[in-house]
């Protein structure tokens, strides 16, 4: 059979209609084979039987029960069925079948087609309609209800198709209705019209069909006309077959044989039926005979009964007369006794009534309590559900937020990386241009004539090289993108594996829960059955009680009647007594004699009657025994039948289960195949990655070609022809590059396809898991069903036993009662003699006692049953509650499982993201290492090139070649490592595959065990053994994955180093290209001269051309003629070939037809032979069959004869047995009569004695009865009292319960009020922070000093020759200022020591205890800290004061010696000393008390906790000094991850300013904690690396830290918009380099990279500063060219602001690369951009640059740029990611982009010398700080609680904006609303337009802006930075608003940066880094307490207040900013 047919069969047999049919009984001969079941349906036998059940009316047609795949019989059965259905609908249901009737022919002929299945569905549908509307419909509907819900729904839909759809079945009952609504009539008429139309169409079609068929018949007859001769002969001859052909004869013979076989069958059936008829008649005759016998017996028994009654009546009358006197006396006494009993019963009734009333009351009370308790329980459940839902929603939102943050981080980081790369290349190109110009000028001055053609070529070649390098870089970036895509693919594969494991675990949990649920359900069912049984028993007892009461009432009435009767008898006796005693005595004697005679006669009769009675009893007992045996046999039969049925069901269920298991196995195999295909697709994707590597190789080849081009350039210097060739080759290269780009696009498309494949793979794996779960659930279900079956069987057997026992007992009781009644009657009759009275007395007494006992028992039972019923009621209630709870728990469980799956998925995605980011960071670090090494080489070569310009350009090209070779080697090594990684991943996947296969095998084994064992236990144990191994394997896989990631990250970092190198090369090539273009122009002039000569030659050639044209015309004519001839010949040849082909085709067709004909003839002959063979076979079989039939008939007759003989013998045997039994009975009767007479005589004598004894006993028992009665009444009264007391106690308990609930509610309200008071306390403690603002005035003074210092430096810089001397003096001054600043800071810290900490309060915040611990140690003197700093590593430094002279000496020595090249090494050593802990694990990260640097050590993992713990230290570190900020940047975000930052401080010029800006924000944030602030200030100032070194940067940093901005209270800061806090970040960013110098290396950076130690990459500066010097004018010109202009701020009058604005324009673009700072921040030393820039800060390597040292503008990155430095940089906190980089470019204006900064800085230097003195200090300051702000903005992207947030991207765009806006605000002395500065960069919008929220919040920003304007540079910086800074510090910001730890600063929360990862992610609420105050406030960080809202207003007020208050003091900052400029200039 076809596969599709089997599928159709399965679908059909699983349809609801077939499942309904199965309820009528198993079909398919009990087997579960789909085909046999289906054929059984198609044959129509089973369906006809169903129809017979529905419609039992007799039908004339017989069904063929043995179809044997006979089409005709099948059709016959189906037609009978359809006819029956049709008649039933019309006659019984009054309905008309309108739908097309099932096509019986189609079903009969081709039952296995899809159409025939549809027709059978029609049949089943019509049968269903009959069943649902027939008389037995309730029974059928009950069966339907027992089916599954899904099948029920399907059956209901089918029923509606029949009953409701008038198009299928039309209801005719409306005809009988008298009134029909017009709407219904209208609908009916419409449907009728439609049916009419359809019938007419069908009639027309049928007529057409008839016409066609008749035409066909006529045609066929015409084709074979019967010849007249043959016909006549046929008529005449008796054999008409003679005219037929041999084939027709054979056919007819076969048909004849078939009809004979049928005839035989029919005859056989007839014979069977006749035999059955004879048998039944015989049985009827026997039954008639038996009936007659029974009737006769019945008549005889009736006659006997009548005679017995007559005798009894006579006897009774005689006995009554004789014994009346004695009986009356006895009755009197008995009545008296019964009277006492009546009283007792009345009392008992009253007691029972009272008990009932009490019970009803208690029941009502308990029900009330129950309802109340249930209501409470329901409320609790609802609240729990709501709570869980809210928690899940919260969790989902948090997950979404985290993912958004991560995504934003990644995007921003990428953005920054790209911008940094762009700026680097621009810087390099500008620098090269500047060098070339300088060299050209020098050459012109020395000797203009010496300028040679070779030099120009050199320049052109260098420019061209630069261009090629740029192109190379773009290609590298595309390759990197493709690599990232391949990494994503691999990660998705890992995700799939993890999801599969988690799914397995969840499925196991679900299975366990299901088993528990099933157990609980079973227990519930057991309890329900028990309760039902108890209820039934209770009802029975109640009915027994009622019957007893009725009996008692009857007895009382009888007794009263007897009493009346006795009274009358007494009166008559008294009257008689008055008559003379003599007469009386005589009468008595006469009566006695007469009585004696009558007694003797009666005794004789009695003995006879007793004998007869005994005989009857025996007969009865025998009959009863027989009846019991028959009943037992019947029961056993029923039981066996039930067991058979049950076993059959079990077998069917097991078979279905096995089929399902097999189907599931097939499905799982299919899924495995799909799995393999998906794995193959993964392999193809890996091949794609290999292709990518091939592209990289092509790229290397291009590099090699570039080298060749350079060589060609050397050779082509003197020839123009060679130049032209070069250009052509260049064009070819460009084309190749375009092709490569196209290839890259194709690869991207392939990557997308791979992603789609991954998605499909995930869906397939999910389906696989679902199927596995369904398999497991099905196996569990089968087990549970088996267990339930076993339990049900046991219960059923127990119930059956109980039932049988009850029936037996019942039968015995009934028989006993009957016997007892009969015996009592007989005894009464016999005792009507003299002894009757005694016997009656005895019997009555016994009855009384029995009834008393029964009554007592029944009352006891009743009470026990009542108690039990109460207990059961309670249990029932409990069970119901439990069931309700169970359902709720199930729902909760489902919800939880869903949540668990969601959480698991999110967790896996988060894990994978983490892994990705770690990989990226490691790759970046490795790339940075490589780049640093290569740059060292390249840098040295550059120096040689610059120094040896005259020696020629050969060396340059050699250097380039060497560099390219090294790059090739590095890329090869990277590829090898990647291949290793891919192989490892392949192995992991293979292991996963093996695990899956092993699990599948285990599942198969479990299925097999299921089939074998029906028990439950073993299978479950096996199924739970496997997950452990899996989990272990997965853990090992995860552990093994870590190192691989690190290697990959190293490789990526190397690649990126290579990319930067290539960019530089491209820049050089571009310069060379420009030179070549100039040479081209020169050559073109020469070409002009040659062209004049060519004109003369052209004239000569014109004459020749004319002659040539004539010749060409002639040749053309000849060619035309030739072509025409050739075309004609071609056409002829084509025609010829066509004809040939046609001919061959015809021949082949002819041959094929001949072959077919031969095949057909052969087949026909074979068929004829088969036919003949079949005919012979048929004849032989028919003969054998007839012989067998004869034998069978003979045997049947024999069998009948034997049966008759057997019956006759049986009858004779029975007669003989009856006679024998009668004789035996007669003998027994005689013997028994004799014995009975003797016994009667004995019993009469005994009875008299017993009577007297019993009377005595009766008296005694009566006395005891009275006593017991009294005791019982007393006990009853006592029980009543106890019951009432119990009820009272319960009521009191309820009252107390209510009281308890009230108290509980009060307690809750008290708790709420307590929390409110705590919040209030927090607010009060916040207010205390405002007192700390006064301390900032000292800081502003220090800033003024630093500004003056800068001015002096600028003046000194004007004279180049005296530069070195001035530099030394300047360093001394700086050191002095630093010492002065240290002293001032110590004084300030001493002042702070005397501040009291804010009042303690009950802190619900987790980190409160940690804060307390941290705050305490800070109160110790700064001197202790000084001692510990020198010896301790950075972590210890944190807790000690690092200002000790020993630590600072090395720095000073370095500062004094500006020319020494060992500077870098010293710095590196210092960093080793302080940063030795970089390698420490997270364990070292715990912040120590009072540690200023603590944030730098924090790790991402601990970020949230540290955010809380680190407040105290953060306060100090931020407020005190730049060094603190640089070292403890992570305070703001527990993990310092601004690599860029460390680098940012490559030049001193910037150091000072950044520190100023940065400190201010810090100050603000931490003002609120005076004690911690003071101590932290001490520690941070002393511990700052700058301070230790004694460099001027430290001094400036400190001076700024006390700027007027510090006066802003921490509250203000918390609420300030980003404008307010960003500057701080900026500042920090600039100063970040100091950190590496001395402060602990930010651990995070080191740990993340896990690579080079701090000193790696440190490179000595060029030996001679003079060689690096450049004139200021030249540098300014260069920078002006490179830096694009940008929008000027509103205050245009300020020149310095203009300069800074110009400088800051580029940064807006470039500043973004905050995070890239990790990678490239190090690469961007400012020395690139500003030749005069001083590298005072330990450039990222941590190398301190001396203040006066010149750094030569250089392509190579200083070691600071090397990857090792990256780690320190990262550590340098979060002040702002973007800052880090900007700071690298020390040019103050461009806080973000180093290049732009340097350019703007150079401009600032030149102008500062002239304008700064006259420029208003504040304005300059304002202009300066804003520019720095840009970088800090980067911090904006981080929320308080988010660990891994860096917002490099925003800073870039916002830095500019921010820089501008503050200027405007300051110029106007009022903020103009949220300027671009405060505006967050919405990464989604990528525009500076303020978002809607920010537009709504101008008020907050305007309030803060004025403060910023007046506050000086720090304040200005704050204007743009407050948000970002706050965000950045949000963990610390919380401390800033110290009094309220729960609600960290709202405004700043918007974007806190935790540099955990390279990827940036903006938190949801705070996602837009620069959002204004209004936006920031509502945003809640995870760690924030919910009481944020109340403080929003206050925070805003504080903002405005702080700004106003701060405006009053003259801000030292205005001067400070120019000072910073001066300082920068001096450094340069």
Curated annotation (Swiss-Prot):
On this chain, the residues bearing Phosphoserine are 227, 239, 486, 1444, 1601, 1806
Sorted alphabetically, which keywords does the UniProt record give?
A: Cell junction, Coiled coil, Cytoplasm, Disease variant, Guanine-nucleotide releasing factor, Neurodegeneration, Phosphoprotein, Spinocerebellar ataxia, Wnt signaling pathway
Q: What is the effect of changing residue 464 to H?
A: In SCA40; no effect on subcellular location; increases activation of the JNK signaling pathway; induces apoptosis
Q: Which GO terms describe its molecular function?
A: dynein light intermediate chain binding; frizzled binding; G-protein alpha-subunit binding; guanyl-nucleotide exchange factor activity; identical protein binding; microtubule binding; PDZ domain binding; protein dimerization activity
Q: Which GO terms describe its cellular component?
A: apical junction complex; cell junction; centrosome; cytoplasm; extracellular region
Which positions carry Phosphothreonine? 1954
Q: Please report, in chain numbering, the residue ranges of the motif GBA.
A: 1661-1691
Per UniProt, the ranges with Basic and acidic residues bias are 1419-1428, 1689-1704, 1879-1897
Compositional bias segments (type: Low complexity): 229-245, 1439-1450, 1517-1534, 1568-1588, 1792-1803, 1902-1924
SUPFAM superfamilies hit by this protein: Hook domain
From the UniProt entry, list the residue stretches annotated as the region DVL1-binding.
2026-2028
Subcellular location, record wording? Cytoplasm; Cell junction
List all Polar residues biased stretches: 1011-1024, 1589-1604, 1842-1855
Where would you say this protein principally sits, based on its record? cytoplasm
Disease annotation reads: Hydrocephalus, congenital, 1: A form of congenital hydrocephalus, a disease characterized by onset in utero of enlarged ventricles due to accumulation of ventricular cerebrospinal fluid. Affected individuals may have neurologic impairment. HYC1 inheritance is autosomal recessive. Spinocerebellar ataxia 40: A form of spinocerebellar ataxia, a clinically and genetically heterogeneous group of cerebellar disorders. Patients show progressive incoordination of gait and often poor coordination of hands, speech and eye movements, due to degeneration of the cerebellum with variable involvement of the brainstem and spinal cord. SCA40 is an autosomal dominant, slowly progressive form. Brain MRI shows pontocerebellar atrophy along with a global reduction in brain volume.
**What job does the chain carry out?**
Required for activation of guanine nucleotide-binding proteins (G-proteins) during non-canonical Wnt signaling. Binds to ligand-activated Wnt receptor FZD7, displacing DVL1 from the FZD7 receptor and leading to inhibition of canonical Wnt signaling. Acts as a non-receptor guanine nucleotide exchange factor by also binding to guanine nucleotide-binding protein G(i) alpha (Gi-alpha) subunits, leading to their activation.
Q: What is this protein called?
A: Protein Daple
- Its source organism is Homo sapiens
């Amino acid at each position: 059979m076809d596969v599709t047919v089997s599928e159709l069969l399965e679908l059909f047999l699983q349809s609801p209609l077939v499942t309904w049919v199965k309820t009528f009984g198993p079909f398919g001969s009990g087997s579960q084979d789909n085909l046999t079941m289906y054929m059984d349906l198609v044959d129509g036998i089973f369906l006809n039987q169903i129809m017979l059940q529905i419609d039992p009316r007799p039908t004339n047609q017989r069904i063929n029960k043995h179809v044997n795949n006979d089409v005709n019989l099948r059709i016959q059965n189906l037609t009978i069925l359809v006819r029956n259905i049709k008649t039933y609908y019309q006659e019984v249901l009054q309905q008309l079948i309108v739908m097309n009737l099932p096509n019986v022919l189609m079903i009969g002929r081709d039952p296995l087609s899809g159409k025939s299945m549809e027709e059978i569905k029609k049949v089943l549908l019509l049968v269903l309609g009959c069943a649902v509307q027939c008389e037995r419909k309730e029974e059928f509907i009950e069966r339907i209800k027992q089916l599954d819900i899904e099948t029920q729904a399907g059956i209901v839909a089918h029923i509606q198709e029949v009953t409701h759809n008038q198009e299928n079945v039309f209801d005719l009952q409306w005809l009988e209705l008298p009134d029909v609504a017009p709407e219904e009539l209208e609908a009916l008429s419409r449907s009728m019209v439609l049916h009419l139309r359809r019938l007419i169409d069908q009639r027309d079609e049928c007529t057409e069909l008839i016409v066609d068929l008749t035409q066909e018949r006529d045609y066929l007859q015409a084709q074979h006309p019967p010849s007249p001769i043959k016909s006549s002969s046929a008529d005449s001859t008796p054999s008409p077959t003679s005219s037929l052909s041999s084939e027709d004869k054979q056919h007819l013979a076969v048909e004849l044989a078939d009809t004979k076989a049928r005839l035989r069958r029919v005859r056989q059936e007839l014979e069977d039926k006749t035999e059955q008829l004879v048998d039944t008649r015989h049985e009827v005759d026997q039954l008639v005979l038996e009936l007659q016998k029974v009737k006769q017996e019945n008549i005889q028994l009736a006659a006997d009964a009548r005679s017995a009654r007559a005798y009894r009546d006579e006897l009774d009358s005689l006995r009554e007369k004789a014994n009346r006197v004695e009986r009356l006396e006895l009755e009197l006494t008995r009545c008296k006794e019964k009277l006492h009993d009546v009283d007792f019963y009345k009392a008992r009734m009253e007691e029972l009534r009272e008990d009932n009333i009490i019970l009803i009351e208690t029941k009502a009370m308990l029900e009330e309590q129950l309802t109340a308790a249930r209501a409470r329980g329901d409320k609790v459940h609802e609240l729990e559900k709501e709570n869980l839902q809210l928690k899940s929603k919260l969790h989902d939102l948090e997950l979404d937020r985290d993912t958004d943050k991560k995504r934003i981080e990644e995007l921003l980081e990428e953005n920054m990386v790209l911008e940094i790369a762009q700026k680097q290349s621009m810087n390099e190109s500008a620098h090269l241009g500047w060098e070339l110009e300088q060299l050209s000028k020098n050459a012109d001055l020395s000797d203009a004539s010496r300028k040679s053609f070779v030099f120009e070529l050199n320049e052109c070649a260098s420019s061209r090289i630069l261009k090629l390098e740029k192109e190379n870089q773009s290609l590298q970036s595309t390759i990197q993108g493709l690599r990232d895509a391949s990494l994503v693919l691999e990660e998705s594969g890992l995700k799939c594996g993890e999801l599969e494991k988690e799914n397995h675990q969840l499925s196991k949990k679900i299975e366990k829960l299901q088993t528990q649920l099933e157990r609980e359900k079973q227990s519930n069912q057991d309890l329900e059955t028990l309760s039902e049984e108890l209820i039934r028993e209770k009802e029975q007892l109640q009915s027994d009680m009622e019957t007893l009461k009725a009996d008692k009432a009857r007895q009382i009435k009888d007794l009263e009647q007897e009493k009346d009767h006795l009274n009358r008898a007494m009166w008559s006796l008294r009257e008689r007594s008055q008559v003379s005693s003599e007469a009386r005595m005589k009468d008595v004697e006469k009566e006695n004699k007469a009585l004696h005679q009558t007694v003797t006669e009666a005794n004789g009769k009695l003995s006879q009657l007793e004998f007869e009675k005994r005989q009857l009893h025996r007969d009865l007992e025998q009959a009863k025994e027989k009846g019991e045996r028959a009943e037992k046999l019947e029961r056993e039969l029923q039981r066996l039948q039930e067991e058979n049925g049950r076993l059959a069901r079990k077998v069917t269920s097991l078979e279905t289960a096995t089929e399902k298991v097999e189907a599931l196995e097939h499905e799982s195999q299919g899924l495995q195949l799909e799995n393999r295909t998906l794995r193959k697709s993964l392999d193809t994707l890996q091949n794609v990655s290999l292709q990518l590597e091939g592209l990289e190789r092509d790229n290397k080849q291009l590099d090699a070609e570039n080298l060749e081009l350079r060589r060609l350039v050397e050779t082509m210097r003197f020839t123009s022809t060679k130049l032209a060739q070069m250009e052509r080759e260049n064009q070819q290269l460009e084309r190749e590059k375009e092709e490569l780009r196209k290839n890259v696009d194709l690869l991207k498309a392939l990557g997308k396809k791979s992603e789609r494949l991954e998605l499909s793979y995930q869906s397939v794996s999910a389906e696989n898991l679902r199927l596995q779960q369904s398999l497991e659930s099905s196996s569990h279900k089968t087990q549970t069903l088996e267990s339930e079956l076993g339990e049900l069987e046991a219960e059923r057997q127990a119930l059956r036993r109980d039932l049988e026992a009850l029936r037996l007992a019942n039968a015995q009781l009934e028989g006993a009662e009957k016997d007892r009644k009969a015996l009592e009657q007989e005894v009464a009759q016999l005792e009507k003699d003299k002894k009757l009275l005694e016997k009656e007395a005895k019997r009555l007494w016994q009855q009384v006692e029995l009834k008393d006992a029964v009554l007592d028992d029944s009352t006891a039972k009743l009470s026990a049953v009542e108690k039990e019923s109460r207990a059961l009621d309670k249990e029932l209630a409990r069970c119901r509650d439990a069931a309700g709870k169970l359902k709720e728990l199930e729902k909760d469980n489902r919800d939880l499982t869903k949540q668990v799956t969601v959480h698991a998925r999110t967790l896996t995605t988060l894990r994978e993201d983490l892994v990705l980011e770690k990989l990226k960071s490691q790759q970046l670090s490795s790339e940075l290492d490589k780049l640093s090494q290569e740059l060292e080489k390249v840098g040295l070569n550059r120096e040689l090139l610059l120094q040896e310009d005259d020696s020629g350009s050969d060396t340059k090209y050699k250097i380039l070649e060497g560099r390219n070779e090294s790059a090739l080697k590095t890329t090869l090594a990277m590829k090898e490592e990647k291949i290793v990684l891919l192989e490892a991943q392949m192995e992991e996947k293979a292991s996963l595959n093996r695990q899956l296969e092993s699990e599948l095998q285990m599942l198969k084994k479990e299925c097999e065990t299921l089939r074998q064992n029906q028990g439950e236990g073993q299978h479950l144990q096996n199924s739970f053994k496997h997950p452990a191994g899996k989990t272990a394997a997965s853990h090992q896989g995860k552990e093994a994955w870590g190192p691989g990631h690190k290697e990959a990250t190293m490789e990526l970092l190397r690649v990126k180093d290579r990319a930067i190198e290539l960019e530089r090369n491209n820049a050089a090539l571009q310069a060379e290209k420009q030179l070549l273009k100039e040479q081209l122009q020169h050559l073109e002039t020469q070409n002009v001269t040659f062209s004049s000569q060519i004109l003369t030659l052209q004239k000569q050639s014109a004459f020749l051309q004319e002659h040539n044209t004539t010749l060409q015309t002639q040749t053309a004519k000849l060619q035309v003629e030739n072509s025409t001839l050739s075309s004609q010949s071609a056409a002829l040849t084509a025609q010829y070939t066509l004809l040939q082909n046609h001919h061959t085709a015809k021949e082949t067709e002819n041959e094929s037809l001949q072959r077919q004909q031969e095949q057909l003839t052969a087949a026909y002959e074979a068929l004829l032979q088969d036919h003949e063979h079949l005919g012979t076979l048929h004849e032989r079989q028919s003969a054998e069959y007839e012989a067998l039939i004869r034998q069978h008939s003979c045997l049947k007759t024999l069998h009948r004869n034997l049966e008759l003989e057997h019956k006759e013998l049986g009858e004779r045997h029975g007669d003989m047995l009856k006679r024998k039994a009668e004789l035996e009975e007669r003998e027994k009767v005689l013997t028994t009569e004799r014995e009975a007479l003797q016994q009667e005589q004995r019993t009469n004598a005994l009875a008299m004695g017993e009577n007297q004894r019993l009377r005595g006993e009766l008296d005694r028992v009566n006395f005891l009865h009275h006593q017991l009665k009294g005791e019982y009444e007393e006990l009853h009264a006592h029980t009543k009292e106890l019951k009432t007391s119990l009820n009272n106690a319960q009521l009191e308990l309820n009252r107390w319960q209510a009281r308890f609930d009230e108290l509980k509610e009060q307690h809750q309200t008290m708790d709420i009020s307590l929390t409110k008071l705590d919040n209030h306390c927090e607010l009060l403690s916040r207010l205390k922070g405002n007192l700390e603002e006064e301390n900032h005035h000292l800081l502003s003074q220090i800033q003024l000093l630093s500004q003056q210092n800068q001015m002096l430096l600028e003046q000194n810089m004007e004279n180049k020759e005296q530069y070195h001397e001035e530099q030394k003096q300047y360093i001394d001054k700086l050191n002095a200022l630093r010492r002065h600043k240290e002293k001032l800071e110590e004084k300030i810290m001493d002042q702070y020591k005397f501040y009291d900490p804010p009042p303690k309060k009950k802190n619900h915040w987790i980190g409160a205890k940690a804060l307390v611990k941290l705050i305490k140690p800070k109160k110790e003197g700064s001197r202790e800290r000084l001692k510990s700093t020198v010896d301790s590593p950075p972590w210890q430094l944190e807790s000690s004061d690092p200002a000790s002279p020993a630590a600072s000496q090395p720095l000073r020595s370095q500062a004094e010696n500006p020319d020494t090249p060992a500077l870098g090494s010293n710095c590196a050593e210092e960093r080793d000393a302080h940063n030795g802990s970089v390698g420490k694990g997270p364990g070292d990260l715990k912040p120590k008390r009072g540690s200023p640097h603590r944030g730098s050590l924090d790790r991402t993992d601990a970020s949230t906790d540290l955010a809380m713990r680190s407040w105290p230290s953060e306060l100090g570190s931020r407020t005190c000094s730049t060094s603190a900020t640089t070292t403890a940047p992570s305070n703001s975000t527990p993990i310092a991850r601004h690599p860029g930052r460390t680098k940012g401080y490559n030049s001193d010029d910037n150091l000072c300013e950044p520190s100023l800006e940065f400190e201010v924000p810090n100050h603000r944030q931490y003002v609120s904690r005076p004690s911690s602030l003071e101590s932290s200030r001490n520690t941070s100032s002393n511990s700052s690396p700058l301070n230790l070194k004694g460099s001027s940067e430290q001094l400036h940093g400190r001076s700024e830290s006390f700027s007027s901005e510090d006066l802003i209270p921490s509250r203000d800061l918390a609420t300030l918009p980003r404008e307010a806090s960003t500057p701080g970040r900026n500042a920090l960013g600039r100063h970040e380099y100091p950190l590496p110098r001395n402060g602990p290396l930010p651990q995070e950076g080191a740990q993340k990279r896990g690579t080079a130690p701090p000193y790696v990459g440190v490179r000595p500066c060029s030996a001679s500063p003079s060689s690096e010097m450049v004139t200021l004018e030249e540098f300014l010109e260069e920078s002006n060219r490179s830096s694009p202009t940008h929008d000027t701020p509103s205050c245009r009058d300020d020149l310095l602001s203009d300069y800074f604005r110009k400088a800051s324009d580029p940064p807006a673009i470039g500043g973004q690369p905050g995070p890239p700072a990790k990678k490239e921040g190090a690469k961007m030393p400012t020395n690139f951009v500003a030749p005069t820039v001083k590298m005072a800060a330990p450039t990222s390597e941590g190398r301190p640059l001396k203040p006066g040292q010149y750094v030569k503008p250089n392509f190579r990155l200083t070691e600071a740029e090397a990857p090792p430095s990256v780690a320190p940089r990262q550590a340098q906190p979060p002040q702002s990611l973007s800052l880090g980089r900007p700071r690298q470019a020390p040019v103050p204006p461009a806080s973000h982009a180093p290049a732009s900064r340097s350019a703007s800085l150079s401009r600032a230097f030149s102008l500062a010398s002239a304008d700064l003195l006259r420029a208003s200090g504040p304005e300059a300051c304002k202009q300066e700080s804003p520019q720095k702000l840009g970088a800090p903005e980067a911090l904006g992207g981080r929320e308080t609680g988010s660990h891994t947030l860096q917002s490099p991207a925003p800073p870039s765009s916002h830095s500019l904006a921010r820089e501008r806006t503050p200027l405007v605000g300051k110029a106007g002395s009022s903020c103009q609303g949220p300027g671009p500065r405060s505006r967050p960069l919405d990464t989604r919008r990528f525009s500076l337009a303020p978002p809607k929220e920010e537009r709504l919040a101008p008020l907050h920003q305007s309030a803060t802006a004025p403060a910023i304007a007046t506050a000086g540079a720090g304040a200005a910086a704050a204007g743009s930075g407050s948000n970002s800074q706050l965000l950045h510090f949000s963990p610390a910001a919380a401390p800033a608003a110290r009094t309220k730890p729960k609600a960290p600063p709202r405004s700043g929360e918007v974007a806190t940066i935790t540099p955990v990862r390279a990827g940036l992610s903006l938190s949801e609420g705070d996602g837009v880094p620069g959002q204004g105050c209004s936006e920031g406030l509502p945003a809640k960080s995870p760690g924030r307490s919910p009481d944020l809202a109340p403080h929003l207003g206050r925070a805003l007020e504080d903002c405005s207040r702080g700004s106003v208050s701060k405006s009053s003091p003259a801000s030292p900052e205005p001067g400070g900013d120019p000072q910073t400029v001066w300082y920068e200039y001096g450094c340069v």
